[in-house]
Amino acid sequence: LGNRSLICDGKNKDAVKYLNSVVKNRSPFRPTAPAMRYDIAKKYYLLRPEIHDCYKTMSATCKCIKGSISSGFPTTHVDGTARIQIVEKQSFLDQLLTKLEPMKIEILANSSLNVSGDPTCFDLIDGLMVCVRTPLRFLLTDIGLLAKKNITN
């Protein structure tokens, strides 16, 4: 989770809507998962310590803290919950969040790298196919950041 993902700024409603409806081609009532570090998660969500490990794999929902701005995040379900992902220290997403800190991005909307109805991408070739078949402009891979214009030429 995070190695084969579609991600964008988790607080940017337009970006999350674009990811969900245009790229993923799925219903707007299916929100993406907010991925963040533990210290950010505890500011916005009521975490249950007994299921902490479930938050690492987006396996549990939690409620937004009452009065918190998280209730207005585009990754929040209509019932005021979110299926959060707490990223592990030194993971790829943790390193990416470090790079995004100067832009004040502390939460990423995270969704599986696939198009509605297709299985999740397995390898680089699958990822390239999703990039070609969708309006994605970039694909971040183990070999670097690939621009769609260079993939299709």
Where are these regions (language model features)?
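Flexible beta->alpha loop and helix N-cap segments adjacent to enzyme active/binding sites
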Residues: L1-N153
